[in-house]
């Protein structure tokens, strides 16, 4: 059962951290970023977290309601000039929050780097510091692992709903999917993340396959990497040391 695996997403420090991660793909001034696509990605991510039955802080849902308000006002036909001004003000306030958080995070990272340098000077070895940085990079990539699956689930969600029939749904277990993934990685040591789901048309199978992959990653049987921001995620079977 999916509930048997306890997974905590600790990479995002809050909804603004998630939004900052989403707007960073545009590589432009925050106040010029198109908000509707960002809002859609945020809502897809939240929906995916629900699908995976993962714990979600209330602040994420509060932000989601605010984003849905902005999106709905954007999609409504123009009513009055005041309506437009109010909508633009809501968008500006949100982007200002994200920008303020970005500045705060940059300052926090600078202070953390300074702290690491001081710790290195007094006690830590160079090897220990490199190890810490490696873990940080891996954690950062984990954000995109969930975002990538969110996109896959959203793309297939409508098709899955349309394909519902009276035929009893096939049951999928994490144990079965772990076995299936192990077979795949035995035949093919390296594969693209998206390839794992290309032949899946059932929502339960998609979710169970993803949970099985997380279990393999947690047990250090599979590693994942990403060459560039929002690029293709590559999975690789880790060699078992004798």
UniProtKB/Swiss-Prot annotation:
It comes from the Bacteria. The keyword RNA-binding does not apply. It is found in: Cytoplasm. Keywords: Cell cycle, Cell division, Chromosome partition, Cytoplasm. GO terms for biological process: cell division; chromosome segregation; DNA replication. One of its GO terms (cellular component) is cytoplasm. Pfam families: SMC_ScpA. InterPro entries: ScpA, ScpA-like_C. Component of a cohesin-like complex composed of ScpA, ScpB and the Smc homodimer, in which ScpA and ScpB bind to the head domain of Smc. The presence of the three proteins is required for the association of the complex with DNA. Participates in chromosomal partition during cell division. May act via the formation of a condensin-like complex containing Smc and ScpB that pull DNA away from mid-cell into both cell halves. Belongs to the ScpA family. This is Segregation and condensation protein A. The gene is scpA.
